[in-house]
């Protein structure tokens, strides 16, 4: 590790977002110099030694075709104070384990040597593949909840977290969705350069936090599971009949299965219990109505299947992290006021 400036390494690959990689690089590289220049016209010097590395150090194109010229290969880096595994996008229906496994040995060795290990978005999957999140909580994009449950059950995904400090000495830190790299950058700056430097950087780059977390942005995964035809038929039915009374019993009857067998197979196919799946669909539909209409909340609750508006509000807050009225104010596409809260 460097004696003068903390060494920060950004690990990127072909599925990394340019916004994450270059956003992190620009913000971290600016620490110690840009704020002084902007506010005092005084020269400064970079406080952090920031480098981009890849699996082989060769020039490549990241997600979207943007060229990346790494400073080095990951194996050229034997020591660093902190490394960031940038997002490495994977379709939720795929299995990225082979792609991620090439980084595992280096990540484990870096952690064993004392480096802080952090990730952004799907970068947490890379850490999980290396076994570094076993027995720990983690943040990642909300859409990867089922993938974590299926491929990495030893890790616990906190779907609403923006930053998750997952090791008691804070040497493993994971960040949620793609733009949560901003929170991670400020955390890194505060950790290595102090709170004042982090605040100065936030002012220069106009960075602010995701105060609502991820839940308001989360959407239900509607993918039909083709491997279980019975459950697929039930998914197709509930997609059109989510507001029906007693929908779980209706799906059970449609399946022709005993209740416990149906619940077990539904959970296995979708990653959710039948009632959780129904509630997620109903709240997703309610979100779209709040975004696009001025209908009163009471009317929306009834339209998606809740006759008790209070129960609807409780469920909405549980799944979305906010109230229907606050969600409408933040996300309404029409800019119209609600006719009842």
What are the language-model segments listed below?
Residues 49-117:
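Flexible gly/pro-rich beta->alpha loop and the following alpha-helix that scaffold active-site loops
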Residues 165-204:
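Conserved anion/nucleotide-ligand pocket segment
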Residues 103-143:
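Catalytic nucleophile loop
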Residues 239-240, 245-281, 301-323:
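Basic/polar phosphate-binding segments, predominantly the helix-turn-helix DNA-binding elements
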Residues 220-246, 252-255, 276-295:
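A short, Lys/Arg-enriched amphipathic alpha-helix from helix-turn-helix/homeodomain DNA-binding modules
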Residues 288, 292, 303, 310-341:
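…primarily DNA-binding HTH/wHTH and HhH modules…
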Residues 192-236, 244:
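Accessory alpha-helical/coil subdomains and C-terminal extensions
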Residues 2-78:
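N-terminal beta1-alpha1 cap of cysteine-dependent amidohydrolase-like domains
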């Amino acid at each position: 590790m460097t004696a003068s400036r903390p060494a920060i390494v950004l690990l990127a690959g072909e599925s990394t977002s340019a916004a994450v990689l270059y956003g992190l690089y620009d913000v971290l590289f600016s620490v110690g110099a840009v704020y002084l220049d902007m506010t005092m016209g005084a020269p400064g010097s970079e406080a952090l030694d920031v480098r981009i590395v890849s699996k082989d150090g060769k020039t490549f194109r990241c997600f979207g075709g943007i060229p990346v010229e790494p400073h080095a290969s990951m194996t050229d880096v034997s020591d660093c104070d902190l490394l960031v595994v940038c997002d490495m996008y994977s379709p939720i229906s795929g299995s990225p384990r082979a792609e991620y496994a090439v980084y595992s040995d280096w990540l484990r060795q870096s952690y064993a040597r004392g480096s802080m290990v952090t990730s952004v978005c799907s970068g947490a999957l890379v850490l999980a593949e290396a076994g570094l999140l076993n027995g720990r909580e983690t943040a990642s994009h909300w859409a990867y909840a089922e993938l974590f449950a299926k491929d990495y059950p030893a890790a616990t995904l906190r779907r609403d977290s923006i930053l998750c400090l997952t090791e008691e000495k804070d040497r493993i830190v994971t960040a949620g969705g793609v733009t949560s790299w901003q929170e991670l950058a400020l955390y890194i700056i505060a950790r290595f350069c102090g709170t004042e430097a982090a605040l100065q950087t936030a002012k220069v780059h106009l960075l602010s936090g995701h105060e609502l977390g991820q839940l308001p942005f989360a959407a239900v995964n509607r993918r039909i599971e083709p491997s279980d035809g019975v459950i697929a038929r039930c998914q197709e039915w509930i997609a059109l009949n989510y507001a029906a009374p007693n929908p779980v019993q209706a799906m059970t009857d449609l399946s022709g299965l005993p209740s416990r067998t149906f619940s077990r197979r539904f959970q296995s196919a979708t990653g959710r219990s039948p009632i959780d799946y129904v509630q997620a669909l109903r709240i997703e539909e309610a979100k779209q109505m709040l975004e696009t209409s001025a209908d009163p909340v009471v009317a929306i609750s009834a339209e998606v299947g809740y006759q008790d508006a209070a129960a609807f509000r409780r469920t909405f807050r549980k799944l979305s992290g906010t109230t229907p009225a606050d969600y409408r104010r933040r996300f309404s596409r029409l800019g119209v006021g609600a006719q009842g809260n």
